[in-house]
């Protein structure tokens, strides 16, 4: 524990909280255009082909965003909405694409948790 004199000489340093989603610039959502839509493989114990897209945002940032749900209709030049939220087993993927918004269709035949996947209520 430092003495009062030591604290007068050098103040306690506060930990700097780094921004986990810098490209959003403190906004909840951001619009962007898909530059490239592709699949990639996750980190080590997992195995799959995860669907991701490289998106150029309206503020000039270019980020990699995850496309959740089964199947999608995205291709190059699709206009999408992204939100924050990383994918734990994909390094560098810190954003999610919102389903059922702009050019992105909702997940077909989805019955549960539909609001997360932009699916309309089935009859």
Curated annotation (Swiss-Prot):
Function: With S4 and S5 plays an important role in translational accuracy. Interacts with and stabilizes bases of the 16S rRNA that are involved in tRNA selection in the A site and with the mRNA backbone. Located at the interface of the 30S and 50S subunits, it traverses the body of the 30S subunit contacting proteins on the other side and probably holding the rRNA structure together. The combined cluster of proteins S8, S12 and S17 appears to hold together the shoulder and platform of the 30S subunit.
Higher taxonomy: Bacteria, Pseudomonadati, Pseudomonadota, Alphaproteobacteria, Candidatus Pelagibacterales
Coiled coil: none
Keywords attached to this entry: Methylation, Ribonucleoprotein, Ribosomal protein, RNA-binding, rRNA-binding, tRNA-binding
GO molecular-function terms, A-Z: rRNA binding; structural constituent of ribosome; tRNA binding
GO terms for cellular component: small ribosomal subunit
Domain of life: Bacteria
PANTHER family, alphabetized: 30S RIBOSOMAL PROTEIN S12 FAMILY MEMBER
InterPro entries: NA-bd_OB-fold, Ribosomal_uS12, Ribosomal_uS12_bac
Subunit and partners: Part of the 30S ribosomal subunit. Contacts proteins S8 and S17. May interact with IF1 in the 30S initiation complex.
Organism: Pelagibacter ubique (strain HTCC1062)
Family as reported in the entry's similarity comment: Belongs to the universal ribosomal protein uS12 family.
Modified residues (3-methylthioaspartic acid): 89
One BP annotation, GO: translation
Name listed for the protein in its UniProt record: Small ribosomal subunit protein uS12
SUPFAM superfamilies registered for this protein in UniProt: Nucleic acid-binding proteins (SSF50249)
